[in-house]
């Protein structure tokens, strides 16, 4: 039976689905300054693509100066590669680089129109950040998260002490970019119960202006991409730990048999072993379904500090 509540949810879902084709790109022009929290691979990628494609100044925040330095070095490397391949000129590269304004202070986000959080997948960390953003950012700013598995409704709830006051929580949304951001076109748009249609429209328009192709997912554990992808990676790890196949054979059969650019174990290294574990934990804890239980080897690798490409060692050595 379709209850009144379910009917409203279905109608809202239909409206949000339609907006993907109707949202005007011009809305992105209202974003005069972007904020990005986290200078890691994801955050830096988002900041760089926004500066290059949309041409907006980007305040890049990370409390760790070493992370900022590493991120900017990576940005310089990517821009230099684009120049060498004649995708952009040196003048364009310099312009893009000048749009990135790194800082260790969250208070620097006081003048942004749109902020995207891209820190590690730790619920308490994200909740704390959004609680701060509610106090720092202007009242019109869109507060987006790049979370790959945590409930948007829960994140939005941290922005207010009064659940009936949705003036801030209505501006919270997920723009889950795919890694690596400069290459992958996909982005998941996930709304919480509080998210307004205006927030959805603005987020979609801005993502399109970045050259991305948005897809919508319900606010469900893992959303779409990781609900499908992570069990695939986890099962590959189980096959390795139980001796069903070697590392090379597992990756080879999936790469050559399904026409994907890399096998599941190499992909796990690229994503980050710790990130894979964090997402599997959320899926398992939120659903209670044993098919999402993280493999023993996955847990052990995180304990060992073998986090994949970013640590120099994972299923492969880098």
Predicted segments with their positions:
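NAD(P)+-binding Rossmann beta1-loop-alpha1 motif at the extreme N-terminus of oxidoreductases
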Residues: 2, 12-81, 85, 136
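Rossmann-fold dinucleotide-binding core
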Residues: 142-218, 226
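Rossmann-like NAD(P)-binding element
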Residues: 63-70, 80-143, 150-151
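Hydrophobic/aromatic beta-strand patches that form the interior of the parallel beta-sheet core
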Residues: 59, 101, 116, 173-175, ...
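NAD(P)-dependent Rossmann-like dehydrogenase/reductase catalytic/cofactor-binding core
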Residues: 2-32, 37, 54-55, 197-201, ...
């Amino acid at each position: 039976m379709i209850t009144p509540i379910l009917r409203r949810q279905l109608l809202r879902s239909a409206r949000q689905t339609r907006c993907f084709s109707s949202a005007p790109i011009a809305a992105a022009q209202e974003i005069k300054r972007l904020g990005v929290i986290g200078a890691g691979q994801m955050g830096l990628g988002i900041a760089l693509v926004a500066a290059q494609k949309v041409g907006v100044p980007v305040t890049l925040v990370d409390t760790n100066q070493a992370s900022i330095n590493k991120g900017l070095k990576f940005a310089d490397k990517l821009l230099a590669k684009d120049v060498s391949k004649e995708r952009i000129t040196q003048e364009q590269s310099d312009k893009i680089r000048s749009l990135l304004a790194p800082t260790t202070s969250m208070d620097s986000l006081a003048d942004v129109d749109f902020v995207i959080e891209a820190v590690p997948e730790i619920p308490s960390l994200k909740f704390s950040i959004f609680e701060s953003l509610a106090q720092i950012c202007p009242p019109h700013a869109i507060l987006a998260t790049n979370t790959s598995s945590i409930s948007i409704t829960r994140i939005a709830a941290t922005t207010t002490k009064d659940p009936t006051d949705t003036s801030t929580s209505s501006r919270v949304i997920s723009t889950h970019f795919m890694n690596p951001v400069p290459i992958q076109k996909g982005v998941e748009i996930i709304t919480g119960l509080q998210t307004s249609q205006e927030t959805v429209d603005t987020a979609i328009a801005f993502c399109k202006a970045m050259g991305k192709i948005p897809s919508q997912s319900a606010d469900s554990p893992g959303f779409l991409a990781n609900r499908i992808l992570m069990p695939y990676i986890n099962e590959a790890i189980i096959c390795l730990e139980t001796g069903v196949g070697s590392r090379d054979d597992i990756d080879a059969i999936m790469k050559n048999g399904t026409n994907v650019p890399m096998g599941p174990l190499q992909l796990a290294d690229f994503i980050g072993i710790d990130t894979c574990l964090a997402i599997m934990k959320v899926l398992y804890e939120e659903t209670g379904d044993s098919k999402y239980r993280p493999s023993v080897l996955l847990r052990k690798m995180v304990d060992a500090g073998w986090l994949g490409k970013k640590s120099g060692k994972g299923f492969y050595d880098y």
